């Protein structure tokens, strides 16, 4: 058992900018603990001699010819933007200043 604490979940919630109740903190601590235990069980699997793979089945990625097509210039793309500065789109700030 990995024993994920309520305080560790509170720290993760703060980093994720989530407001969690005390009940949710305890509930998520138990759930995360269970997930960590399940994932750690993978490390106990006997895998000696098993070749590493990314998929259990072979995956074929079909290739296509690269075709040059007409695209917008930077000026054309920025022309429809509500705000632009120095060839870049300007968007509203969504995160704090990082002083936490």
From Swiss-Prot:
SUPFAM superfamilies, per the entry: Glu-tRNAGln amidotransferase C subunit
NCBIfam families assigned to the protein according to its UniProt record, in alphabetical order: gatC (TIGR00135)
InterPro entries with a match to the protein in the record: Asp/Glu-ADT_sf_sub_c, GatC
Family assignment from sequence similarity: Belongs to the GatC family.
Name of the gene encoding the protein in the UniProt record: gatC
Record key words, sorted: ATP-binding, Ligase, Nucleotide-binding, Protein biosynthesis
First-level EC class: ligase
Name of the protein this chain belongs to: Aspartyl/glutamyl-tRNA(Asn/Gln) amidotransferase subunit C
GO molecular function terms attached to this record: asparaginyl-tRNA synthase (glutamine-hydrolyzing) activity; ATP binding; glutaminyl-tRNA synthase (glutamine-hydrolyzing) activity
Record keyword Ligase present: yes
GO process terms (BP): glutaminyl-tRNAGln biosynthesis via transamidation; regulation of translational fidelity; translation
Catalytic activity as recorded in UniProt: L-glutamyl-tRNA(Gln) + L-glutamine + ATP + H2O = L-glutaminyl-tRNA(Gln) + L-glutamate + ADP + phosphate + H(+); L-aspartyl-tRNA(Asn) + L-glutamine + ATP + H2O = L-asparaginyl-tRNA(Asn) + L-glutamate + ADP + phosphate + 2 H(+)
Record's subunit section: Heterotrimer of A, B and C subunits.
Pfam family of the protein (one): GatC
């Amino acid at each position: 058992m990995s024993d994920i604490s309520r305080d560790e979940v509170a720290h993760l919630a703060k980093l994720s900018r989530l407001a969690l109740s005390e009940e949710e903190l305890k509930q998520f601590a138990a759930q995360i603990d269970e997930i960590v235990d399940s994932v750690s069980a993978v490390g106990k699997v006997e895998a000696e001699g098993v070749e590493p793979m990314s998929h259990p089945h072979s995956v074929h990625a079909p290739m296509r010819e690269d075709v040059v097509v007409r695209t917008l210039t930077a000026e054309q793309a920025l022309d429809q933007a509500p705000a632009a500065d120095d060839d870049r789109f300007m968007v509203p700030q969504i995160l704090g200043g990082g002083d936490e």
